[in-house]
Amino acid sequence: VVYTDCTESGQNLCLCQGSNVCGQGNKCILGSNGEKNQCVTGEGTPKPQSHNDGDFEEIPEEYLQ
């Protein structure tokens, strides 16, 4: 599982795979072709300060389809 930090709404690209690391009240949305995913304003999980196991919450499966 790969985690990519993204903190600026609509600016930073994010992987959206296995976790939502947008933080700051943002959520990660998938690009149409699986690329250029973006953080947008919306419910999201907090962005942790470290990259240790257990710091990330999994994205519910319905968002991975």
UniProtKB/Swiss-Prot annotation:
GO terms for molecular function: serine-type endopeptidase inhibitor activity. It comes from Hirudo medicinalis. This is Hirudin-3B'. Belongs to the protease inhibitor I14 (hirudin) family. It comes from the Eukaryota. InterPro entries: Hirudin (IPR024793), Hirudin/antistatin (IPR011061), Prot_inh_hirudin (IPR000429). Residues 1-3 are annotated as: Interaction with thrombin active site. Gene3D superfamilies: Thrombin Inhibitor (Hirudin), subunit I. Disulfide bonds join C6-C14, C16-C28, C22-C39.
